[in-house]
């Protein structure tokens, strides 16, 4: 039976997530966490502007978190209902369209990941500490939010936890205040951020600088001390990656970049805004995960600064990050992007060709074929435009839509300005059909910029 608060889905890929009637501009989270009992208490302030007059509003929020009080614009809500992963609240008075909507939620509970078709995502208890890995819909496991990637906002996150632990969140560390046996860490992420990219990392970590002092982009490692030697070897070339990607993609979009390595093993690394999280198994002292180091760094441009408006366009994140792996290989003395692209195409040709990359469906949106064929789409475009125009396009793409939401149509439209020949056919066969196209020959006819 549908709840009386049911509304038509924002996104068919995640019909339970996202909310109507307002746009969030800021989150202020005050959190307290006890690692021994995995107990989280929080106060969340959500600042928004209404888009229409309506009697009630909803937020995404896990049922593992118990709500004790809700305020709307400083007054108690007439009532609130927390069910089926939604917190529905009714203000005492209707708010006009364009009016300020400030929601304060007090809550506590034992957070746990959200189960979905892609496994468990969100808050995860570690052997000692916790991590948050929310893609695509796990943010509601630890705070009430408008959990859809098109909803980007600034964040202030305060986290109080036991003093032996280091607590990391997105953005700049504003303060670190020890008190008795606990420490409060306060972080500010001024750049707009999608809810799934917000993160908390808590563990027995130490913070180290990565690279030389005075690097254009400050980089740090937050890692268990026992992994320092392996990390220094495995991530030694990250400053070179940063320099390369800044040259090819445009300026790094945030103030700094931090890599976390957990003391636990992780199946795959995880991107967050300004942060990437790796497992201890990715830090082997043999650079066995270097392509993933490049992949996660590239997500700071493609996924974090430029964030999809709808999940069907996931190739705009993963195809670009996968292609960045090939760009790094090419620049660092490994196989060229063309060699890797042709090898990837040969491998894809042996697999089922039953996915449309531009709309793969929710079940397959994290399928490796989306990643690889997305990267192949970019390589086909690069062969069509040649290097100079291709990388000029990428830099304009990241500059024009910096800290914004994006669609495939916007990228296709922008790319069209870089070629006298129509490009829609290229995008149509690579993104809009199931059969795997052939790559153009290396060194084929280049088209001229029309601008």
Task: Give, region by region, the residue ranges found by the protein language model.
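N-terminal, polar/Ser/Thr-rich
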Residues: 1-41, 68, 125-129, 445-451
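Beta-strand-rich interaction surfaces with strong enrichment in secreted/lumenal proteins
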Residues: 29-32, 46, 77-78, 90-95, ...
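Hydrophobic helix-coil surface modules that form long, contiguous segments used
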Residues: 42, 145-294, 323
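Surface-exposed beta-strand/loop patches in extracellular or lumenal glycoproteins
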Residues: 45-65, 143-147, 155-162, 409
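A surface-exposed beta-strand-loop module
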Residues: 62-124, 181-184
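Acidic/His/Gly-enriched intrinsically disordered linker/tail segments
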Residues: 268, 314, 318-380, 384, ...
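Zinc-dependent metallopeptidase catalytic helix centered on the HExxH motif
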Residues: 276-339
């Amino acid at each position: 039976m549908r709840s009386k608060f049911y509304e038509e889905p924002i996104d068919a890929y995640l019909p339970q997530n996202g909310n109507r009637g307002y746009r969030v501009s800021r989150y202020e989270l005050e959190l307290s966490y006890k690692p021994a009992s995995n107990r989280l208490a929080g106060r969340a302030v959500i600042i928004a502007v209404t888009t229409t007059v309506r009697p009630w509003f909803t937020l995404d929020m896990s049922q593992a978190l118990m709500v004790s009080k809700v305020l709307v614009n400083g007054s108690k809500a007439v009532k609130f209902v927390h069910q089926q992963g939604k917190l529905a609240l009714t203000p005492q008075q209707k708010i006009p369209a364009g009016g300020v909507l400030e929601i304060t939620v007090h809550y506590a509970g034992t957070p746990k990941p959200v189960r979905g078709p892609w496994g468990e995502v969100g808050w995860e208890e570690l052997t000692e500490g916790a991590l948050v890995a929310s893609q695509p819909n796990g943010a509601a496991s630890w705070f009430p939010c408008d959990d859809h990637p098109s909803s980007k906002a600034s964040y202030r996150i305060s986290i109080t936890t036991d003093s032996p632990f280091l607590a990391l969140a997105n953005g700049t560390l504003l303060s670190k205040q020890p008190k008795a046996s606990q420490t409060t860490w306060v972080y500010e992420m001024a750049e707009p951020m999608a809810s799934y990219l917000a993160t908390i990392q808590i563990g027995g970590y130490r913070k180290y600088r990565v690279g030389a002092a005075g690097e254009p982009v400050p980089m740090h490692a937050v890692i268990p001390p026992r992994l320092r030697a392996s990390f220094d070897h495995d991530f030694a070339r990250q400053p070179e990656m940063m320099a390369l990607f800044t040259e090819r993609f445009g300026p790094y979009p945030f103030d700094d970049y931090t890599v976390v390595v957990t003391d636990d093993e992780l199946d795959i690394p995880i991107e967050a805004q300004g942060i990437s999280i790796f497992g201890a198994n990715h830090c082997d002292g043999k650079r066995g995960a270097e392509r993933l180091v490049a992949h996660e760094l590239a997500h700071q441009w493609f996924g974090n600064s430029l964030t999809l408006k709808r999940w069907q366009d996931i190739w705009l994140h993963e195809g670009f990050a996968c292609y960045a792996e090939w760009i790094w290989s090419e620049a660092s003395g490994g196989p060229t992007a063309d060699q890797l692209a042709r090898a990837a195409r040969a491998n894809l040709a042996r697999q089922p060709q039953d996915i449309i990359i531009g709309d793969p469906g929710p079940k397959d949106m994290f399928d490796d074929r989306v990643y690889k064929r997305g990267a192949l789409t970019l390589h086909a475009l690069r062969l069509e435009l040649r290097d100079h125009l291709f990388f000029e396009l990428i830099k304009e793409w990241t500059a024009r839509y910096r800290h914004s939401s994006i669609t495939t149509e916007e990228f296709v439209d922008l790319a069209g300005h870089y070629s006298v020949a129509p490009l829609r056919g290229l995008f149509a066969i690579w993104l809009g059909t199931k059969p795997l196209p052939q790559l153009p020959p290396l060194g084929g006819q280049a088209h001229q910029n029309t601008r």
